[in-house]
Amino acid sequence: ADDEEELRLLVKKARREIRASYLKYESQENPDQCVLIQEKLRGQEYGLDVIHDLKGNQRTVVVKEKEAMRSGETDGAKTVDHERLRRLGQILGSLTRHKGNLDVDAFESDGVCYVLEMNARFGGGYPFSHAAGVNLPYALVKWALGQEPEEKYLAARAGVRAQKDIRIMIYKEESK
């Protein structure tokens, strides 16, 4: 929205669309607060994989600069050495003490880091950490067996740029 009047119209339209969809059930408890307005930031978006062992001990934080997005998911990224964001991931991990991966979306704007969302799961950006050398599935299996994975499986190389690819595969052509 370019101004408050346009914002009010867009919120009104969004509420009308919510009332006309299945979301009306999700928002019926407080219909006046069914629309979330998020400030648009100018800057760079990042993805963090905050990796812990199965006891909740922090093992590593991988920072990826998002270069391309598709349908809200990271489509292209580069692993980077970003000390401030790595430290942010360490702080979040020390507070959550989660097990496995904490997928964090962060934004840096005018030198300030913002956390957009956190999900305790393999996120759509994990393949970029994997491409840079991290092998979290292997580490999780080792930890589940009471063993320690080799450090190389928890270390991401900075500067690895990767892109997801979607291809249509024909496995077998039906004969007529």
Predicted segment positions?
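A general structural signal for well-ordered secondary-structure junctions
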Residues: 7, 17-20, 99, 150
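ATP-dependent carboxylate activation and anion-phosphoryl transfer catalytic cores
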Residues: 78-176
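Phosphate-binding site of ATP-dependent enzymes
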Residues: 11-90, 94-96, 107-108, 112-114
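Active-site donor-binding loop signature of nucleotide-sugar glycosyltransferases
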Residues: 2-3, 39, 65, 120
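Phosphate/diphosphate-binding glycine-rich loops and adjacent basic-rich segments that engage nucleotide
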Residues: 1-14
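ATP/adenylate-binding site constellation spanning eukaryotic-like Ser/Thr protein kinases
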Residues: 4, 42, 133-134
